[in-house]
Curated annotation (Swiss-Prot):
It comes from Herpetosiphon aurantiacus (strain ATCC 23779 / DSM 785 / 114-95). Residues 243-331 are annotated as: Alpha C-terminal domain (alpha-CTD). DNA-dependent RNA polymerase catalyzes the transcription of DNA into RNA using the four ribonucleoside triphosphates as substrates. Belongs to the RNA polymerase alpha chain family. Keywords: DNA-directed RNA polymerase, Nucleotidyltransferase, Transcription, Transferase. It catalyses: RNA(n) + a ribonucleoside 5'-triphosphate = RNA(n+1) + diphosphate. Its EC number is 2.7.7.6. This is DNA-directed RNA polymerase subunit alpha. Homodimer. The RNAP catalytic core consists of 2 alpha, 1 beta, 1 beta' and 1 omega subunit. When a sigma factor is associated with the core the holoenzyme is formed, which can initiate transcription.
């Protein structure tokens, strides 16, 4: 392998929500290669916490007015989206807000469990206009990545209001590539990277996490030679052999509903072969993918004659479907 100039990383400016970093020297072209890759990962793949739904006493939908409260439910939902959280919980947790008027309701009025912290306690939520006004609210917090619209989640019970969740703690990333000198050579790159966060994560920690994500993905390619280059078929741990042309088929070709498609994509399931390798229990374990979506996936596979091309002990085939295929009734 050719020698690569090993760069040094330096933090040239730091604040609670801002960091400016310098990486140099880089071989020509590597400034944009690293800068663009880090920027994309920083904006999309850093985990964070957000409110995913709320429940307000006496309110059944987001268009309802609340007696004694200046804002209606829709405005409160918009204000709740601005609460920035730091959560150490593996599962969704609940926070409680109970406030009587008159007065202003802020994020600091919310009671949090020990593993959740509000980093902007002065954030405005609502105003109670009278002494008999009361606002009782339950907020559900979850950790995830990126942005999750309310319409892409399972329907919630009556009385609960879903919230568009902005999980990513990184607000903005800029990078600039400049020329730098090594000895008499002036065509090396200097990468200047600026990161703005919401305060729930330090810019330096976000940069480190983004680099680890890139390393994990790159390691898959680096280990490519460990696999048999002559292998033309892909098999799972259960001995199921899937022809490569079927395995590599994108899930877009199944023409799934938007909801089912988004569930698979968020779980990094992008190929039909990945679906065929999973049994029903594994598929149902995919976040927000229920029995209805499971049945839809199975029907789409049968519709496109993808299941009959495989042994009838295929992971996704249950006993009833296998019987139908053997009888010819599933064609």
């Amino acid at each position: 392998m050719l020698d690569i100039a090993m760069p040094k990383l330096e933090c040239v400016a730091a604040a609670e929500n801002y960091g400016r970093f310098k990486i140099e020297p880089l071989d020509p072209g590597y400034g944009h290669t690293l800068g663009n890759a880090l920027r994309r990962v920083l904006l999309s793949s850093i985990p964070g916490a957000a409110v995913i739904k709320i429940k307000i006493d006496g309110i059944f939908h987001e268009f309802s007015p609340i007696q004694g409260v200046r804002e209606d439910a829709t405005e409160i939902v918009l204000n709740v989206k601005g609460i920035r959280l730091r959560s150490y919980a593996e599962r969704p947790v609940k926070m409680i807000l109970s406030k009587t008027g008159p007065g202003v309701v802020r994020a600091s009025d919310i009671e949090c469990p020990s593993n959740v912290e509000i980093v902007n306690p002065d954030h405005y939520i609502a105003t109670l206009d009278s002494s008999d006004a009361r606002l009782d609210m339950e907020l559900t917090v979850e950790r995830h990545r990126g942005y999750l619209p309310a319409e892409n989640r399972d329907p919630v019970p009556i009385g609960e209001i879903p919230v568009d969740a902005i999980f990513t703690p990184v607000h903005k990333v800029n990078y600039v590539v400049e020329h730098t000198r090594i000895g008499g050579m002036t065509d090396f790159d200097r990468l200047l990277l600026e990161i703005w966060t919401d305060g729930t994560v330090k810019p330096g920690d976000a940069l480190s996490y983004a680099a680890q994500v890139l390393v994990q993905y790159s390691s898959i390619i680096a280990d490519f030679n460990r696999f048999d280059d002559e292998q033309e078929q892909v098999g799972d741990a259960n001995g199921l052999v899937i022809p490569s042309e079927i395995y590599d088929m994108p899930i877009e070709d199944l023409d799934l509903s938007t909801r089912t498609y988004n569930c698979l994509k968020r779980a990094d399931i992008t190929k039909v072969g990945q679906v065929l390798e999973m049994d029903e229990k594994q598929l149902l374990a995919v976040r927000n993918l229920g029995q209805k979506s499971m049945d839809e996936i199975r029907e789409k596979l049968i519709e496109r004659n993808l299941l009959p091309t495989l042994p009838f002990n295929s992971a996704i085939l249950n006993t009833n479907v296998a019987a139908r295929l053997n009888d010819g009734s599933a064609e």
